[in-house]
């Protein structure tokens, strides 16, 4: 397939944003060298563990990694002779979790590469643990689980919206997250690491879309009782046959948000989609007749003609919301993790706000827990609440854009 050039890239990598924030000005209150010294000093007596907020749903959460190979196509970056290889994770409502370890936010190898890319000292021990228990049995409800597929942003990784993912799983969804190899920090079972490509060919949103459609095939295989892991690693008890291929939604951040829209246009298996500040480039000029929600921050309809054009193409149920004070990284895990890391680094409040916006991180967490759940509950489970009806006193910062 042909890859979509990623330059000029609307999606911002963490490296660029972290560097810009840490070196905000020549006279910054905390120079990068001093910040690194503060980080090293803080970890000298033991690793500082960052934390993620717990999900609010009634179920414990389980997770399992999957090593996937799409033998139907060559890798668009590695080229002919190399099938497309992906790392994914399935998150789900679980049971019997008491003695099972919690999954890390990223594997140590991937986190080490991620921190090096950001310019931080290599201490993967600081990475947070998620709420999910590795390999826990699936909670049996007597019916199959609705499925969501998550696509990350450019230069990121499949765990970048873990708060949102584990929230949905705690409320009864199976969520499949995928690393888009060569535009992600990804570690394979044999220890091989891949990082975002620095030279062409770059992956574009359409390449992400092809990955997502392959993951949809994997979902159907799991639903039919087939283990898709190429290494044959055992799956959690009850996972085979637990997913409902007739109730599938998709969501993504930034480039992943654009890919979500493109996937829905290409594949009828996705019944509802959510874009988290996706730039909608390349311009989408095809109508979409299924439910779609847009959570804007930096890439608004007013600022981005491509987003405005996409909005006009939504012919089914649609909703556009934006939280006051939100920017591109507000709706993800960074809103929680960057303030914690900033405190360790000695960053100023202004430097932190340059990265995640001025919205209170605790409010950002509640927004990213509540609104995606309400959207998918409405369209995949037909559970109608009132959160999506209009402005809500519990969320005064969330504006509905007509």
Kindly give the residue locations of the regions a language model identified:
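N-terminal secretory signal peptides
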Residues: 1-12, 24-27
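N-terminal export leaders
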Residues: 14-21
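Domain-level recognition of soluble alpha/beta enzyme cores
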Residues: 41-148, 351-361
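Alpha/beta-hydrolase-fold serine-hydrolase catalytic core, especially in secreted/extracellular enzymes
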Residues: 48, 53, 334-335, 339-402
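Short substrate-entry loop that stabilizes the transition state in hydrolases
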Residues: 139-145, 150, 154-186, 302
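Alpha/beta-hydrolase active-site loop
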Residues: 197-242
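Short glycine-enriched nucleophile-adjacent loop
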Residues: 257-266
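The feature captures the conserved acid-bearing segment of alpha/beta-hydrolase catalytic domains
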Residues: 272-331
């Amino acid at each position: 397939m042909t890859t979509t050039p990623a330059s000029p890239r609307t999606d911002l990598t963490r490296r660029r944003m972290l560097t810009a924030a840490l070196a905000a000005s020549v006279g910054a209150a905390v120079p990068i060298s001093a910040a690194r010294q503060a980080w090293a000093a803080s970890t000298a007596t033991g690793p500082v563990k960052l934390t993620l907020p717990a999900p609010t749903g009634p179920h414990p959460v389980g997770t399992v990694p999957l090593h996937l190979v799409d033998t139907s196509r060559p890798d668009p970056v590695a080229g002919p002779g190399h099938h497309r290889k992906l790392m994914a994770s399935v998150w789900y409502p679980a049971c019997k979790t008491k003695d099972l370890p919690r999954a890390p936010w990223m594997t140590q190898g991937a986190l080490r590469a991620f921190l090096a890319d950001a310019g931080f000292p290599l201490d993967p021990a600081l990475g947070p643990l998620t709420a999910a228990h590795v390999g826990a049995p699936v909670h049996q409800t007597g019916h199959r689980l609705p499925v969501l597929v998550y696509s990350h942003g450019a230069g990121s990784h499949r765990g970048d919206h873990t708060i949102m993912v584990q929230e949905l799983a705690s409320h009864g969804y199976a969520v499949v997250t995928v690393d888009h190899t060569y535009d992600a920090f990804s570690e394979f079972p044999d220890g091989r690491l891949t990082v975002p490509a620095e030279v062409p060919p770059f992956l574009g949103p359409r390449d992400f879309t092809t990955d997502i459609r392959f993951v949809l095939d994997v979902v159907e295989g799991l639903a039919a009782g087939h283990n898709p892991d190429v290494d044959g690693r055992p799956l959690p008890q009850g996972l085979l046959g637990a997913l409902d291929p007739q109730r599938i939604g998709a969501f993504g951040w930034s480039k992943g948000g654009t890919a979500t829209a493109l996937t829905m246009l290409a594949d009828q298996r996705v019944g509802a989609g959510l874009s988290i500040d996706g730039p909608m480039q390349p311009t989408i000029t095809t109508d979409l007749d299924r439910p779609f929600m847009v959570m804007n921050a930096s890439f608004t309809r007013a600022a981005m003609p491509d987003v405005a054009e996409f909005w006009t193409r939504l012919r089914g149920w649609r909703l556009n919301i934006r939280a006051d004070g939100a920017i591109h990284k507000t709706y993800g895990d960074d809103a929680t993790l960057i303030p914690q890391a900033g405190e360790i680094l000695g960053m100023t409040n202004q430097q932190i706000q340059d990265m995640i916006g001025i919205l209170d991180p605790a409010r950002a967490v509640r927004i990213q827990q509540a609104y995606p759940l309400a959207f998918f509950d409405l369209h995949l489970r037909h559970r109608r609440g009132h959160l999506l009806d209009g402005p809500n006193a519990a969320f005064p910062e969330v504006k509905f854009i007509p």
